[in-house]
Amino acid sequence: MKQQGLGFESFEALSHDAGSQGIQAPVQLISGYLNADQQAALLNEVDTYPLTRPEIHVYGQNHAIPRTQAWFGNSGCDYLYSGLFVKALSWPKYAGKLREKLRRDFGITANGVLVNRYANGQDSMGWHCDDEPEILACSDIASISIGASRDFVIRHKASQQQYRIPLHSGDLLIMHSPMQDEWEHCVPKRLKVLEPRVNFTFRELIKHYHGA
């Protein structure tokens, strides 16, 4: 695989359909998409992000989510998910460069990124699908992992068939349409994991969906 420097230039990615691993789902895994220098630049930048642990309302009670997060995006790309309305913060330097890299390499035209930081294996994300109405229909969602390896588990809504996809630092997972219509996904707890993991999930939203 050709890897290039910190400038996030295009390169010839080793890409394969996850179906080659027996996973019959519209996902594409690119192992080692980011090199060590690129990962380090992003991790250093994450330390400056205004990460929060918001509360969501579930079954009549408020619960803090089991991770910290921040939403960055273009002007007019505010986001409502899990009952939380968040205003888009301005793009950080290296997250913005990564967005441009995804556009050059795969034609992904994201205008926002949700950053989730998992402090260790105690932090997690429950079953869900990224099907909010402000996400542009049939658009791809790109997910980049940095730090500790974690399992990404997908579950078919109709058959309940599950597949586990281990994601390692620097890996890129692209979820193609109709992934969000037919599948759910989660990041389960892994108590033996002691190191942090950061995930960047790039999405394309309908601009000004929630007004000016």
Give the ranges of each region predicted by the language model.
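Non-heme Fe(II) oxygenase metal-center motifs and adjacent flexible, charged/small-residue loops
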Residues: M1-A212
